[in-house]
Amino acid sequence: MEGAGAGSGFRKELVSRLLHLHFKDDKTKVSGDALQLMVELLKVFVVEAAVRGVRQAQAEDALRVDVDQLEKVLPQLLLDF
């Protein structure tokens, strides 16, 4: 992700490359609007994962978020998306 604050997020080039890595047909194209939507979806997903990880860490009286907390919130997060 880019720097913190407003305007931070994933670069379109990165998201486009990630999408194309998983397309079965090399000729598949992604429109600019679809790409922008994926960028926003990834941004929301990552922020939500971080927030849920913090809440889980607080519930466990942990001082920092660790992989363990993220692993605990990930199943429900995936179901919510």
Curated annotation (Swiss-Prot):
Pfam family, one: CENP-X
Secretion signal, residue range per the UniProt entry: none
Chain positions with N-acetylmethionine modification: M1
Top-level lineage group: Eukaryota
UniProt main location, coarse: nucleus
Gene3D superfamilies given in the database record: 1.20.5.4980, 6.10.130.30
One Gene Ontology biological process: resolution of meiotic recombination intermediates
Keywords: Acetylation, Cell cycle, Cell division, Centromere, Chromosome, DNA damage, DNA repair, DNA-binding, Kinetochore, Mitosis, Nucleus
Compartment(s): Nucleus; Chromosome, Centromere; Chromosome, Centromere, Kinetochore
Molecular function, one GO term: DNA binding
Record bears the keyword DNA-binding: yes
Entry GO terms, CC: chromatin; cytosol; FANCM-MHF complex; Fanconi anaemia nuclear complex; inner kinetochore; nucleoplasm; nucleus
InterPro entries found in the cross-reference section: CENP-X
Its biological purpose: DNA-binding component of the Fanconi anemia (FA) core complex. Required for the normal activation of the FA pathway, leading to monoubiquitination of the FANCI-FANCD2 complex in response to DNA damage, cellular resistance to DNA cross-linking drugs, and prevention of chromosomal breakage. In complex with CENPS (MHF heterodimer), crucial cofactor for FANCM in both binding and ATP-dependent remodeling of DNA. Stabilizes FANCM. In complex with CENPS and FANCM (but not other FANC proteins), rapidly recruited to blocked forks and promotes gene conversion at blocked replication forks.
Quaternary organization: Heterodimer with CENPX, sometimes called MHF; this interaction stabilizes both partners. MHF heterodimers can assemble to form tetrameric structures. MHF also coassemble with CENPT-CENPW heterodimers at centromeres to form the tetrameric CENP-T-W-S-X complex. Forms a discrete complex with FANCM and CENPX, called FANCM-MHF; this interaction, probably mediated by direct binding between CENPS and FANCM, leads to synergistic activation of double-stranded DNA binding and strongly stimulates FANCM-mediated DNA remodeling.
Protein name as catalogued: Centromere protein X
Organism encoding this protein: Homo sapiens (Human)
Upper classification of the organism: Eukaryota, Metazoa, Chordata, Craniata, Vertebrata
Gene label: CENPX
